[in-house]
């Protein structure tokens, strides 16, 4: 069953944040990320949400720990404010 790591945070500059994200400093694929989706709030484009899909909870927890370490680094502190993580179990998804 798929496990999702939901990440929510405010970024100081979306374009700068996206450039760093695209360099993949944490090795998403190697860490077990199967798929991800990036979303922004319509009325606050500095608020970013991501869903990262993993095969299991252990991989999601390990990646969450890597994210926390990145956020406390100097680079992370310049780009990300008020980070929140949730590990969730998708119950149902349908295309209509």
PLM features per residue range, with description:
Residues 1-3, 94-95:
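Short, low-complexity N-terminal intrinsically disordered segments enriched in polar/charged residues
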Residues 3-10, 37-67:
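Short, well-ordered beta-strand segments in beta-rich or mixed alpha/beta enzyme
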Residues 13-36, 68-72:
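Short amphipathic alpha-helical segments
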Residues 15-17, 58-60, 93:
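Residue-level signal for secondary-structure boundary sites
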Residues 31-49, 72-96:
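Glycine-rich beta-strand-turn "strand-cap" elements at beta-sheet edges
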């Amino acid at each position: 069953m798929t496990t999702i790591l939901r990440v929510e945070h405010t970024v100081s500059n979306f374009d700068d944040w996206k450039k760093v994200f695209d360099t993949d400093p944490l090795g998403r694929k190697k860490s077990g990320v199967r798929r991800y989706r990036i979303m922004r709030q319509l009325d606050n484009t500095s608020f970013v949400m991501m869903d990262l899909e993993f095969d299991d909870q252990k991989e999601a927890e390990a990646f969450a720990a890597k994210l926390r370490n990145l956020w406390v680094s100097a680079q992370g502190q310049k780009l990300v404010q008020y980070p929140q993580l949730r590990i969730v179990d998708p119950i149902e998804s349908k295309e209509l």
